[in-house]
Amino acid sequence: MMDDTAMPARAEADAAEDELAAPAGIDRTAKADKDANRVSPMMAQYVEIKAANPGSLLFYRMGDFYELFFEDAEIASQALGIVLTKRGKHLGEDIPMCGVPLTRSEEYLHKLIALGHRVAVCDQLEDPAEAKKRGSKSVVKRDVIRLVTPGTITEDSLLDAKRENVLLAVARTRASGEGAYDYALAFTDVSTGSFRVVASDGDMLAADLARIDPAEILVSDAVYDDEELRDFWRGLSTPVTPLPKQSFDGPQAEKRLAAFFGVATADSFGSFARAELIAAAAVVAYIERTQLGARPALAPPQREADGGSMLIDAGTRVNLELIRTTSGERRGSLLAAIDRTVTAAGARLLARRLAEPLTDIAAIRARHDAVGFLVEETELREALRKRLAAAPDLARALSRISLGRGSPRDLGAIAAGLKEGLAISSAFGPETPRDIARCARLLAAVEPWLAEELTAALADELPLNRRDGGFVRQGYDLDLDSTRALRDESRRVVAALERRYVDETGIKSLKIRHNAVLGYFVEVTAQNADRLREAPFNATFVHRQTMAGAVRFTSVELGDLESRIASAGERALALEQTIFDRLAAAVIEASRPIREAAEALAELDVLTALARLAVDERYVRPEMTEGVDFAISGGRHPVVEQALARGGGPFVANDCDLSPPETAQDARIWLVTGPNMAGKSTFLRQNALIAVLAQAGAFVPARAARLGVVDRLFSRVGAADDLARGRSTFMVEMVETAAILNQATRRSLVILDEIGRGTSTFDGMSIAWASLEHLHEVNRCRALFATHFHELTALTQRCQRLANATVKVTEWQGDVVFLHEVIPGAADRSYGIQVAKLAGLPKMVIARAKAVLTELEAAERVSPAQRLLDELPLFAAAARPAPTLAAPTGPHPAEPVLEELDRLDPDALTPRAALDALYRLKAMLRDAADD
């Protein structure tokens, strides 16, 4: 016997087609004018539901499809690349329509959410057959069951397992002073339950948003439309959702928070500024709205300490490729290079720690203690990693259960995670570092009975959906066991009945099947159908449905059997649903210790991963100091080093010492010169990345490192046009430089690469000169300043804490060889022409460039511009011919000879072949001279 589980093919969709089109038998042309202004019942329902969900694309269930109409259809069609068609008319106009199959709806939802759209999922709340009982024109009951937005998704199929999915609200309140405002950010990951708030201001807002990296931003209409902020919001790549002013209602904020968490007052969470309360309340209000009243297991909001993490602006994060590369990919970033985590939660926590390195030296040292302990304890580290790899994603499973979207597999994940956590908690002795000991305590705090109860209740193989049943272990509930036995016995009776019908009718292909519309039925091929319609079988079998190639019948005996099976099956499923609800309630009751256990598992994963990284890549523990030290011995770029290792090449390690000289209290600045491709940018970036790694709690790629805590990290490395804001490359460069010079403090670290290159030589040199002096005299910070303006090296005579450094190169047979070694001193040349030659510029261009360079270098310092105009015909307004420098009008006659000579390999030629080649070359030269 086989079950036919397919749904009736778009039965409801066909009914809707009838609603939208003229009934059969009536002239459609004549009826069109009459019905031009009539709204069909189905479309009236659609319009009503759509009006209640503005700003969202409405997925409207029609049988086996979700369909979209009107403007939603046009948007979805373009976004998803699916066909836009039309279905009937509304108020005399064609209705645009597109649809996606129910079976692929999650895939299309993922695409729409990734593009920043919000989707309201409207489902059928009853079977179409129930609607027909109320009358032929009755519409199936429907309503929105999910509001899916970029910041509130919890389904694994829509989430990146290794990336947080943050919903963030920005609140603004008036501050003292004319036109002054206080800002606050509240942000939560609904899929894990984390919830934090932080104070901000207009200057810090962009940096805070870059650090948190939200999936969706909530702001009030007034703030979104503020003239000063309008371009800012619209320039963000993150979806921004404007909300009515009431969502940011200050007087109701505290009450809303207290009601959400079920406490008398929000004061129990700590002291919050007014803007912080408003932002937090806006977040929970939006969650309640999008989750249709369901409440995820959020942690109470925690206030971030001011200055608790290294400030890294958005541009610096992009330049350093901390979490993603400039093209938006994870691969090739610092995170990808150091990630040795074995759990999704650990990967998310590692990304967060890289995004917000600590500034509290005690907390940094505590993380280093934990990593160092695990570096030494090899067996313990590897045993922990093995257990952690078996731990599911507790936090996301808990969130789905608390929202009523949990599955049997989510309950299984809770059971498995808690069991692994309890086992891990007993693995540590009394001499465990502080951070690890805290994790062990949190894991041990979960009562063992919950994991035991879940394990006893759940089967080994769990279905994806609770509605499928079959997830309760045999023997757990006696009532369920007896009901299942009745159901399963009935199924064996159906199989026996099928065999009897085959024997009685002689139709070997006869099958008893089942679907949701007909229930159980007998199916035979069209060729055998007449046999059942004739005596004596027509007294037993009643025709029900004719299909293409098959005919379906039923019988009284089969109907009675179906009633018994349905009753037992429905009761068994109902019992399982009751057990599921009871287990889910127990999990929700223990949500706080479960959430804390999930955080502990993630932290242990990060610590063991960083220890494994240190062992594998030879990283060392940095010495953290209270001062402004920055002394790195044998530093390496973590990403470039691994890339070179994959190709079998070594990475050249370099020292960097920006610590204050003995006679000064402020840090050094290194002025780095050297040719392009020599490794200046790599050197600058690697030192910034070492600071980030150290303060994130990791060991660093170096032989030794002594570092004072960096409060702010600034980088201006590379630039591009900002066409959306009408900014040229040079303007972007100047804006970034201005931010650095205005904000860098004595404890900051600044890396600057080629300031002033986007304008004329003298303008650029002047700006670079003045910027370098400002860093030295005003900011007095640690800095690496790379430049091609060699004239700046003379500033070391006036600036006590400025030191010259250069990237070592050598020449071999006219070519430049990059040694990638940073040494004291200044470069005397940029080797730009040699680099151009390596890049493959035509030989004639290289030769011309050398000639021009010779003239430039020989130019007199007095009035050089006129000298160049006179002696370089290519640039002169009225050229005075100079035979050796005349601008070429075509290929040089000798160029074929040079190319032929370049192709020859003397070591591969026999004496006779070499002599022939020599004669051939002389002949080519003679022909060239004749031309």
UniProtKB/Swiss-Prot annotation:
It holds the Pfam family MutS_IV. Gene3D superfamilies: 1.10.1420.10, 6.10.140.430, DNA repair protein MutS, domain I, MutS, connector domain, P-loop containing nucleotide triphosphate hydrolases. The keyword Manganese does not apply. Keywords: ATP-binding, DNA damage, DNA repair, DNA-binding, Nucleotide-binding. ATP binds at residues 674-681. One of its GO terms (biological process) is mismatch repair. One of its GO terms (cellular component) is cytosol. Residues 1-10 have a biased composition (Low complexity). Residues 1-34 are annotated as: Disordered. It comes from the Bacteria. GO terms for molecular function: ATP binding; ATP-dependent DNA damage sensor activity; damaged DNA binding; mismatched DNA binding. The keyword Magnesium does not apply. This protein is involved in the repair of mismatches in DNA. It is possible that it carries out the mismatch recognition step. This protein has a weak ATPase activity. Belongs to the DNA mismatch repair MutS family. This is DNA mismatch repair protein MutS. The lineage of its organism: Bacteria, Pseudomonadati, Pseudomonadota, Alphaproteobacteria, Hyphomicrobiales.
